[in-house]
Structure formats: structure tokens, C-alpha cells
């Protein structure tokens, strides 16, 4: 039997409406689409996933007390450079970053993961500039 060598496949564009969807459950579906694990010919070392456009990221839902208790931290490397931002404030100022952060943690770390992450397009409102690619609406 010959060794299977995967070919580069033409990615499709998918549109997902995040309104009323739970953050983590939606992020896992998006990560699966980005990696291409929904395809029967999936190969771990090839970027064969789809481009994913997410709209209405500002209307995403979280369960429990996460709005007040979940805190995003980042460190600049300097003394006193630790920034802490609660989820509630992050949703108010940059709602697309919340979903991007959740999906990025579910992708592989390394060059392939960075390449896959570039295929994710998240927008706070209902409009997006990817009409020319004719993304197909996917119900999650």
C-alpha cells in the first residue's frame, strides 16, 4: 500500500452568527472548522480547514458568574506591567477579542496554529467585508 500524501485543498468560507451562543461551545466548533477535523481526509500537519467569519460577537453568551469573575491577564515584561481586564469590560470594549482568545487557545501552538488563526475573522456587529467570498451560513 502506498503512503497517503495529502494535497492542498481549496478552503471554503463559512459564516457563523454568534448571537445567543455560548462562548466555549461556539469556540470548539470554530476551532474544529479551522483545523479541518470535520473533513474525512483530515491530516494533522496540513492546513486544510475553512475560513470562518463570525458576526455578532458582541451578543455572545457566557454562563454562571463569568462576566464578573473571569479575568484576562497580560504582562508587558516590565515591573508593574501586569494588566487585568474582567470579561465584562472586555466585552464592552473589544467583544471580538473574547472569541479570538478562546479559539486561539484551542488551536495548535506553533507555525501551523498561527496560520490557522489567520483564517478566523471575527466582527462585533452583523456586517462583515467578506461578501465577495460568498460565505455559506452555518448553523451551530
UniProtKB/Swiss-Prot annotation:
GO terms for molecular function: mRNA binding; structural constituent of ribosome. Keywords: Ribonucleoprotein, Ribosomal protein. Gene3D superfamilies: Ribosomal protein L13. Transmembrane segments: none annotated. One of its GO terms (biological process) is negative regulation of translation. InterPro entries: Ribosomal_uL13, Ribosomal_uL13_bac-type, Ribosomal_uL13_CS, Ribosomal_uL13_sf. One of its GO terms (cellular component) is cytosolic large ribosomal subunit. CDD domains: Ribosomal_L13. It holds the Pfam family Ribosomal_L13. This protein is one of the early assembly proteins of the 50S ribosomal subunit, although it is not seen to bind rRNA by itself. It is important during the early stages of 50S assembly. NCBIfam families: rplM_bact (TIGR01066). Belongs to the universal ribosomal protein uL13 family. Part of the 50S ribosomal subunit. This is Large ribosomal subunit protein uL13.
Amino acid at each position: 500500500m502506498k503512503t497517503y500524501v495529502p494535497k492542498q485543498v481549496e478552503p471554503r468560507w463559512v459564516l457563523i452568527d454568534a448571537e445567543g451562543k455560548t462562548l466555549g461551545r461556539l469556540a470548539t466548533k470554530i476551532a474544529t472548522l479551522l483545523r479541518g477535523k470535520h473533513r474525512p481526509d483530515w491530516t494533522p500537519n496540513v492546513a486544510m480547514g475553512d475560513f470562518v467569519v463570525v458576526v455578532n460577537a458582541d451578543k455572545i453568551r457566557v454562563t454562571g458568574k463569568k462576566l464578573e469573575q473571569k479575568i484576562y491577564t497580560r504582562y508587558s515584561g516590565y515591573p508593574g506591567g501586569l494588566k487585568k481586564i474582567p470579561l465584562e469590560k472586555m466585552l464592552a470594549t473589544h467583544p471580538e477579542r473574547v472569541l479570538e482568545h478562546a479559539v486561539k487557545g484551542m488551536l495548535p501552538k506553533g507555525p501551523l496554529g498561527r496560520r490557522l488563526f489567520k483564517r478566523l475573522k471575527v466582527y462585533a456587529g452583523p456586517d462583515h467585508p467578506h461578501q465577495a467570498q460568498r460565505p455559506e451560513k452555518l448553523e451551530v
